[in-house]
Amino acid sequence: MEKSITNSPVLSILSYCAASILMTVTNKYVLSGTSFNLNLALLAVQSIVCLTAISIGKSFGLCKFRSFNADEAKKWFPIALLLVVMIYTSSKALQFLSIPVYTIFKNLTIILIAYGEVLWFGGSVTSMALASFVLMVLSSVIAAWSDISGAIAVSGSATTTVTALNIGYFWMMSNCFASAAFVLYMRKRIKLTNFGDFDTTFYNNLLSIPVLLIASLLFEDWSPANLAVNFPPESRNLIFFSMVVSGLMSIGISYCSAWCVRVTSSTTYSMVGALNKLPLALSGIVFFGTPATFSSVSAIFVGFVAGIVYAVAQIQKKKAEAALPK
């Protein structure tokens, strides 16, 4: 029974969807303050909390994963490094962009992963999948136009607003490339190492911590003045609590990502992310008061349709492959 649950594609997909929504909303809350600039420190805290929690779980027999092995760690380190780049660029993008825009642009990762599978795993792209890619790009264009025009209308300063959003789009595109590289490389390495889901979570977080801490100490401002700005007395305890909660949330997204990739495929994993964009984008409107304009809702809808078209394309592709003579 337990084995059938851990190998269930449907359950892994639903769990990944729930975890990604919780993680995005929690991170957006922590990063929503314009003064917060210790992104690497936040990510280090998340990894430390996640590693501590699964280690406690292992000691109580709640989960199992391999003991540390230097040779395995050396082989897994590039993936952990890609994970650091992925979550850092994600946190920077969330600082500058609203959740709906962020989630719509994440669709572009699917295109990169699909063509990555063509190059490295002998995959193929059907005409229907190509049509979904066009819709994904269209939804991103609509979202960007809506975001820029809406922000200018609110602030009244076109130059400052466009500059800030351009920074956000730069981090967003960087995140798309990092996410695609992470998913593709992790799928290949999981097959070679035969890692379980908690093995992946353990090594991802363990190897990320020193990289994040060193990078934070080198590149972020740890002066008393900046710490006071990042953690003002009136909200300090709430920020600390939110950072710990986001770390606990990272267990869910880290485990569910590895689980979903293992029991499905990297392309299905990215497709699920696309279908998950509708509730994820709506969470930004519900929890953070993102304006629900005609253009922003249209962008969300087009992005959602793109995900459905892509899902249908993948189903048809699987049926066609199954019909081929063995």
Swiss-Prot record:
Segments crossing the lipid bilayer: 5-25, 36-56, 75-97, 101-123, 130-152, 164-184, 209-229, 238-258, 269-289, 292-312
Cytoplasmic side stretches: 1-4, 57-74, 124-129, 185-208, 259-268, 313-326
Main subcellular localisation: Golgi
Any matching Pfam family: UAA
InterPro entries given in the database record: SCL35B1-4/HUT1 (IPR013657), TPT_transporter (IPR050186)
Single GO cellular component term: Golgi apparatus
Membrane topology: Multi-pass membrane protein
Disulfide pattern: none
Keyword tags: Cytoplasmic vesicle, Endoplasmic reticulum, Golgi apparatus, Membrane, Sugar transport, Transmembrane, Transmembrane helix, Transport
Single GO MF descriptor: GDP-mannose transmembrane transporter activity
All ranges on the Lumenal side of the membrane: 26-35, 98-100, 153-163, 230-237, 290-291
Biological process, per Gene Ontology: GDP-mannose transmembrane transport
Assembly description: Homooligomer.
Family: Belongs to the TPT transporter family. SLC35D subfamily.
Protein name, entry field: GDP-mannose transporter
Originating organism: Yarrowia lipolytica (strain CLIB 122 / E 150)
Lineage start: Eukaryota, Fungi, Dikarya, Ascomycota, Saccharomycotina
